[in-house]
């Protein structure tokens, strides 16, 4: 109880001291190292995470600790240990206990060929795929929070708490998770994707995913026209051993091979840079003036276009889960259409197993709360807060 009280005091102090970070502001936030939320297992405690030099988890095998990065590299840092003797490039199978995720990588820094497993409904007992047999020099297991799908992007934590979402992000990496709400850091632009920040992320105990660049195809956002440089920056974050989300591009640059995200995914595959989740933005751009005679007909037509877009993206990236980190029916539309689309789109996204998370983007003229000092929910905010949402994942994640 004392630790929980201290934790809440730290959270409140951190949140109150941080200025708002706008999505539309190119300035990178200062990184604030968060408190430790989940301590590592005490000495002598077995985690149940077992690696084996044989197929089907047979002997010889050994257990590894939670949070620690095991590598063939020599590291003096607290969060690193050498792989047990005889296991570098010798791991053939493993047991991952339920409620955790694990990354196995070819290179000692977590880059190169790699794979991320998530044990959601049961322990995962697997042989490594052929592409990693005799190659693993990096292993990390961290706890995985299988939270519900509905979240929000907001720069003020008071708004986030009022909305009663399961997860949030703020286009930066300077806030923290609390027991009821998970935080997902974002390396908004290329300067945020650095070895120094990767080291800090490794030390955090309140995160299991990372969002990467925000609209790198846009001149007024991350603005990263050099695809090879974007992949190289992205690879810094692979060193964390966390589950990785792709850069989130504007809606028209997501599904065509010759557009920004298609080029990035092709280059990432060539570099063997793992992408676990594709992050997406959608605002019905191009149809925002194509309105119907009633709000309901308009919302229905928008939902139909959204469904087509989702199908196209899923067809383009069938091996990745999807997160809609920004979406709405268009900032120019009225509140009635937003409310209708908000409910119908969430219901549809809830029905898709390959869509893990989604976050409605509240237009400036239709905020989620009244703001300071009371942060009372508006009609928009109340509607979003009351939408039911299932768990992000309903099965173990076992890539091939």
Task: Cite the ranges covered by each PLM segment.
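Aromatic- and acid-rich polysaccharide-binding/catalytic face
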Residues: 170, 185, 214, 261-304, ...
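Compact beta-sheet-dominated domain cores in extracellular/mature segments
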Residues: 29-151, 156-164, 175-177, 392-395, ...
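C-terminal motif of bacterial Sec signal peptides marking the signal peptidase cleavage site
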Residues: 17-20
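N-terminal carbohydrate-binding/catalytic regions of secreted carbohydrate-active enzymes
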Residues: 86-89, 149-211, 217-218, 227-228
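Acidic (Asp/Glu)-rich catalytic clusters
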Residues: 159-163, 174-184, 196-207, 233-241, ...
């Amino acid at each position: 109880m004392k630790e929980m009280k201290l934790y809440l005091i730290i959270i409140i102090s951190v949140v109150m001291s941080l200025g708002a970070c706008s999505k539309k502001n190119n300035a990178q936030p200062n990184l604030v190292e968060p408190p430790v939320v989940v301590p590592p297992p005490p000495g002598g405690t077995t985690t149940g995470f077992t690696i084996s030099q044989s197929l089907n988890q047979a002997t010889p095998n050994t257990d590894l600790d939670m949070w620690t990065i095991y590598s063939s590299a020599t590291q003096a840092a607290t969060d690193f240990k050498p792989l047990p003797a005889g296991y570098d490039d010798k791991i053939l199978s493993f047991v991952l206990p339920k409620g955790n995720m694990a990354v196995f990588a070819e290179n000692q820094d977590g880059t190169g060929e790699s794979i991320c497993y998530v044990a959601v409904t049961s322990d995962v007992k697997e042989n490594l795929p052929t592409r990693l047999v005799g190659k693993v020099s990096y292993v990390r297991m961290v706890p995985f929070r299988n939270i519900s799908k509905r979240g929000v992007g907001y720069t003020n934590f008071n708004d986030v708490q009022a909305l009663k979402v399961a997860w949030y992000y703020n286009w930066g990496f300077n806030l923290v998770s609390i027991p009821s709400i998970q935080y997902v850091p974002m390396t908004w632009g290329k300067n945020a994707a650095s070895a120094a920040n990767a080291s800090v992320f490794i030390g955090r105990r309140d995160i299991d995913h990372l969002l990467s660049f925000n609209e790198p195809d846009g001149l007024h956002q991350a603005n990263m026209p050099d695809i090879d440089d974007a992949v190289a920056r992205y690879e810094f974050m692979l060193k964390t051993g966390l589950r990785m989300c792709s850069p989130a591009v504007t809606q028209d640059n997501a599904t065509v091979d010759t557009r920004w995200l298609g080029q990035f995914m092709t280059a990432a595959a060539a570099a063997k840079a793992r992408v676990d989740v594709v992050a997406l933005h959608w605002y019905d751009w191009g149809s925002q003036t194509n309105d119907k005679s009633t709000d309901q007909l308009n919302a229905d037509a928008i939902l139909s276009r959204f469904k087509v877009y989702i199908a196209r993206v899923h067809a383009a990236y069938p091996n990745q889960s999807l997160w809609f980190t920004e979406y709405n029916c268009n900032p120019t539309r009225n509140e009635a259409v937003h409310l209708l689309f908000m409910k119908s789109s969430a219901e549809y996204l809830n029905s898709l197993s390959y869509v893990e998370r989604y976050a409605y983007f509240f237009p400036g003229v239709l905020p989620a709360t009244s703001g300071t000092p009371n942060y009372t929910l508006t009609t928009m905010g109340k509607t979003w807060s009351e939408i039911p949402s299932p768990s992000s994942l309903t099965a173990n994640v076992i890539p091939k």
